[in-house]
Amino acid sequence: MSYKPFNIVVILLFFIGVLLVFFKLISIWLLVIVVLAYLFFLLLISTNVQWNFFVKAYNNNHTVTNGEIALTFDDGPVENTLEILALLKKYNAKASFFCIGKQIKENPEIFQKILQEGHLVGNHTFSHTRKMGFLRTQQVIEEINRCNKIAFEVGGINLKTFRPPFGIINPKVERALISTGHQVIGWNLRSYDGILNSKNFILKRIIKNIKPGDVILLHDNNLQTVEILEQLLLFLQNNNYRSVRVDNLFQLHAYS
């Protein structure tokens, strides 16, 4: 069931609940609990792109058996990206960078270097605003288009893949993506490198859970990610894994 008919059913059930409360057939507290549960459900489906509730997202590829995985980096390009690029080159690995438009504008040479070294770049909106979940449809479209515009000006490419900031997908983002035609790239293995401070814990968490076809979420604006990455690349090399671009993992067109 898509969101719109689902929401209509919920609204009808809510009014039925109000009537039941009015005629004292159920407690008002039961209705309050149900409403709160629904709001919590909305929060979950809006912040978990992997659930594919509003849009189809490419989170992992279960059909992969040859050890291919995808390393993905969000929130660059930044100075730290250069160290990440050096490590990827050292271990002959390819990755995907979901770039913020304003960071491309501030660091055009780094953005160009990502492309020159054969990695994928995708759209991560222009500003990566914390208000992403509250933007109107047209505002989301503008965020996506502005990022695409600066990427084209700097790199001469038209981005077709998109990763939502904070993994937020709601009906407004859904409508924006229908308008822009971007393909959504999610993840199924989150490193939490932007939240946790223990490099060993983060690395062990990835290594413990990794399997062929996985999409791993990292951040190139986090200093500890460089140290984590080298150890991770060593593990991949020693255990017959190979990092590829997400367009190759899913057989997608990255640019148009």
Q: Would you name each region that the model predicts?
A:
Residues 85-99, 119-120, 137-168, 175, ...:
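CE4/NodB-like, metal-dependent polysaccharide N-deacetylase domain
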Residues 75-79, 98-107, 131-138, 163-169, ...:
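Acidic-and-aromatic substrate-binding clefts and catalytic sites of carbohydrate-active enzymes
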Residues 42-132, 142-146, 150, 158, ...:
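Active-site beta->alpha N-cap acidic-glycine motif
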Residues 84, 107-110, 173, 198, ...:
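Residues at alpha-helix caps and immediate loop-helix transition turns in enzyme cores, especially N-
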Residues 73-75, 99-101, 123-125, 164-166, ...:
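A cross-domain feature marking catalytic cores of carbohydrate-active enzymes
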Residues 34, 78-82, 198-202:
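Short, acidic/polar
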Residues 174-209, 241-253:
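His/Asp/Glu-enriched short active-site or ligand-binding loop at hydrolase and phosphoryl-transfer sites
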Residues 1-71, 86-96, 208-256:
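Terminal accessory/targeting
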